[in-house]
Amino acid sequence: WIMGHMVNAIAQIDEFVNLGANSIETDVSFDDSANPEYTYHGVPCDCGRTCTKWEYFNEFLKGLRKATTPGDSKYHEKLVLVVFDLKTSSLYDNQASDAGKKLAKSLLQNYWNNGNNGGRAYIVLSIPNLAHYKLIAGFKETLTSEGHPELMDKVGYDFSGNDEIGDVAKTYKKAGVTGHVWQSDGITNCLLRGLDRVRKAVANRDSSNGYINKVYYWTVDKRATTRDALDAGVDGIMTNYPDVIAGVLNESAYKAKFRIASYDDNPWETFKN
């Protein structure tokens, strides 16, 4: 999965997919009442990027729905996965469940079109703080009470705080999550970060009793770092330059081993060689 980083304006969906992304990451900020409000990152952000592009969250969802609904004039067949980077650090811990409920309502109405031919992309809820694990239950309860528990088949999870792998595993246990797990590792492109924790995550993914289904690394803008991440065995790379990642995947060393994921590749299944 080539994951376009910080895609917060509707116009950027086309831009990143046209550069080679089959997945995008979108920031979601919340108001004081835990309503998802804007797709907005803010300052500071990655080097070389404009930090302040934004939409109202529900409007972004409508644009995203068009981009992922077959038959729509804006449809992109290859856009198959969306990571919502949930900026919950502005909330109190006890608001996490409410944030999940309100997020589910927004997605149900504006993205899934109340279960009637909505967008088809798989969705990852990426949570920065382990203490906010109740967001997941709130989200699930709402889809169930609104009569659409089947949409949970399209939803996965990520804790993005670079926490100890063991602590993340314990948190999923508390949250009652037993699958659909992506594990992120990374740092802003302005700084360097080694691949030690990525390798631990990959080892967990490939063990018989691990909790991880997929591992992604962020934010990668250079060819050399891309090669290092692929050599470590990641499933996804988040980038400001999808064309750079696509270029490396085309190199003979990687062409035989990796391919770009399509809609038929289940993002919740651990890939077995």
Swiss-Prot record:
Disulfide cross-links: C45-C51, C47-C190
Gene Ontology CC terms: extracellular region
Main location: secreted
Pfam families attached to this UniProt entry: GDPD_2
Cofactor(s) in the UniProt record: Mg(2+)
Keywords, sorted A to Z: Cytolysis, Dermonecrotic toxin, Disulfide bond, Glycoprotein, Hemolysis, Lipid degradation, Lipid metabolism, Lyase, Magnesium, Metal-binding, Secreted, Toxin
Subcellular location: Secreted
Alphabetical GO biological process terms: killing of cells of another organism; lipid catabolic process
Binding site for Mg(2+): E25, D27, D85
Domain of life: Eukaryota
Protein name per its UniProtKB record: Dermonecrotic toxin LdSicTox-alphaIB1avi
Catalytic activity of the protein: an N-(acyl)-sphingosylphosphocholine = an N-(acyl)-sphingosyl-1,3-cyclic phosphate + choline; an N-(acyl)-sphingosylphosphoethanolamine = an N-(acyl)-sphingosyl-1,3-cyclic phosphate + ethanolamine; a 1-acyl-sn-glycero-3-phosphocholine = a 1-acyl-sn-glycero-2,3-cyclic phosphate + choline; a 1-acyl-sn-glycero-3-phosphoethanolamine = a 1-acyl-sn-glycero-2,3-cyclic phosphate + ethanolamine
Protein source organism: Loxosceles deserta
Glycan attachment points: N250
